[in-house]
């Protein structure tokens, strides 16, 4: 009869003990936990700026976190970044992270942070616990635009003030402003040409004005047509003598007879108004109307922050329109940190 502790029994007991060890130690080590993953087996990560990581031992962290850089964290915020596993260096995974960035910015230092399943030294990490920490730096173009904006700080301050008044929220008042301007122009034209104002009496003189002596040789004139000033009509010709259609408006004595604006003043004002409206129709493509200031063309690219020091224009600028940001694919390279 074989002993229970014989060689055959010893081998059987060893296998049974190993099986029991695997059943008890395996779950403790996370071998059967679907949330436990070997770090080097993670092939890619897709991270979002408005989401948090999973957590088990520690608090969750943002999937994307800017930690500094020459451009600062408030200048631009990428929405989605994808990181790919580029290899194993014997201790950590090396990552290449890509996203679309404004042409003024680039990635600085990057590091992928993952929560170790049991500790910060564990090769296994919790699924979904990885996030990216990155620095945001200026490109050469961004530094150039930054220097240019520093030289034009005064103009930038004016444009900031202008944008507050002529933002998209106030564009619905443009029609009202146009009506007010047109009414003002109509009032000025009425006062200059159609309104018969009050005139001051002529200065005392022993001799009558030249126009009065001239009228002795002409027949009396009737009243001027309704709606027009008398100095624009003058004495009417009834067939005897020669008179001018504009009468005393062109005589040397008008300064004594009329203290209000004369024909030449009205003509000059009309010319100025015509020039303003003509300039509006011949405006450059960089302005929308004569009461919106024109902006010169700048480098074809805009910056994400409204009226930040790096704000530029692509084509025309209007306070009531938006322009797209010019971007390109940027890459950042870094390793892994387990927490």
Curated annotation (Swiss-Prot):
<comment type="subunit">
    <text>Interacts with STIM1; the interaction is inhibited by the interaction of STIM1 with EFHB.</text>
</comment>
<dbReference type="GO" id="GO:2001256">
    <property type="term" value="P:regulation of store-operated calcium entry"/>
</dbReference>
<feature type="region of interest" description="Disordered">
    <location>
        <begin position="313"/>
        <end position="339"/>
    </location>
</feature>
<dbReference type="Pfam" id="PF06682">
    <property type="entry name" value="SARAF"/>
</dbReference>
<keyword id="KW-0472">Membrane</keyword>
<protein>
    <recommendedName>
        <fullName>Store-operated calcium entry-associated regulatory factor</fullName>
    </recommendedName>
</protein>
<comment type="function">
    <text>Negative regulator of store-operated Ca(2+) entry (SOCE) involved in protecting cells from Ca(2+) overfilling. In response to cytosolic Ca(2+) elevation after endoplasmic reticulum Ca(2+) refilling, promotes a slow inactivation of STIM (STIM1 or STIM2)-dependent SOCE activity: possibly act by facilitating the deoligomerization of STIM to efficiently turn off ORAI when the endoplasmic reticulum lumen is filled with the appropriate Ca(2+) levels, and thus preventing the overload of the cell with excessive Ca(2+) ions.</text>
</comment>
<feature type="topological domain" description="Lumenal">
    <location>
        <begin position="31"/>
        <end position="173"/>
    </location>
</feature>
<keyword id="KW-0732">Signal</keyword>
<keyword id="KW-0256">Endoplasmic reticulum</keyword>
<keyword id="KW-0109">Calcium transport</keyword>
<keyword id="KW-0406">Ion transport</keyword>
<keyword id="KW-0812">Transmembrane</keyword>
<keyword id="KW-0106">Calcium</keyword>
<feature type="transmembrane region" description="Helical">
    <location>
        <begin position="174"/>
        <end position="194"/>
    </location>
</feature>
<dbReference type="InterPro" id="IPR009567">
    <property type="entry name" value="SARAF"/>
</dbReference>
<feature type="signal peptide">
    <location>
        <begin position="1"/>
        <end position="30"/>
    </location>
</feature>
<keyword id="KW-1133">Transmembrane helix</keyword>
<dbReference type="GO" id="GO:0006816">
    <property type="term" value="P:calcium ion transport"/>
</dbReference>
<keyword id="KW-0813">Transport</keyword>
<dbReference type="GO" id="GO:0140268">
    <property type="term" value="C:endoplasmic reticulum-plasma membrane contact site"/>
</dbReference>
<feature type="compositionally biased region" description="Polar residues">
    <location>
        <begin position="316"/>
        <end position="330"/>
    </location>
</feature>
<dbReference type="GO" id="GO:0005789">
    <property type="term" value="C:endoplasmic reticulum membrane"/>
</dbReference>
<feature type="topological domain" description="Cytoplasmic">
    <location>
        <begin position="195"/>
        <end position="339"/>
    </location>
</feature>
<comment type="similarity">
    <text>Belongs to the SARAF family.</text>
</comment>
């Amino acid at each position: 009869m074989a002993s229970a502790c014989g060689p055959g029994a010893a081998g059987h007991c060893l296998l049974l003990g190993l099986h029991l060890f695997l059943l008890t130690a395996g779950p403790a080590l996370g071998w059967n936990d679907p949330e436990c993953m070997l770090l080097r087996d993670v092939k890619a990560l897709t991270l979002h700026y408005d989401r948090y990581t999973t957590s088990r031992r520690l608090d969750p962290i943002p999937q994307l976190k800017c930690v500094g850089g020459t451009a600062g964290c408030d200048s631009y915020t990428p929405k989605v970044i994808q990181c790919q596993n580029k290899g194993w260096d014997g201790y950590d995974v090396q990552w290449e992270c890509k996203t679309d960035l404004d042409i003024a910015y680039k990635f600085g230092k990057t590091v992928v942070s993952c929560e170790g399943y049991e500790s910060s030294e564990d090769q296994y990490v919790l699924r979904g616990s990885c996030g990216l920490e990155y620095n945001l730096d200026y490109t050469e173009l961004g530094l150039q635009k930054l220097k240019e904006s520093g030289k034009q700080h005064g103009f930038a301050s004016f444009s900031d003030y202008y944008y507050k008044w002529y933002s998209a929220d106030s564009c619905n008042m443009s029609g009202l402003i146009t009506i007010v301007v047109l009414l003002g122009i109509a009032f000025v034209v009425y006062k200059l040409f159609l309104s018969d104002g009050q005139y001051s009496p002529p200065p005392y003189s022993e001799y009558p004005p030249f126009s009065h002596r001239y009228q002795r040789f002409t027949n009396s004139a009737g009243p001027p047509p309704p709606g027009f000033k008398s100095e624009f009509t003058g004495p009417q010709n009834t067939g005897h003598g020669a008179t001018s259609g504009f009468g005393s408006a062109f005589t040397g004595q008008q300064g004594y007879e009329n203290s209000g604006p004369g024909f030449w003043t009205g003509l000059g004002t009309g010319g100025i108004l015509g020039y303003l409206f003509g300039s509006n129709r011949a405006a450059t493509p960089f302005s929308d109307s004569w009461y919106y200031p024109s902006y010169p063309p700048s480098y074809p690219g805009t910056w994400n922050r409204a009226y930040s020091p790096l704000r530029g224009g692509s084509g025309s600028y209007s306070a009531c329109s938006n322009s797209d940001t010019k971007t390109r694919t940027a890459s950042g390279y870094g390793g892994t940190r387990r927490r």
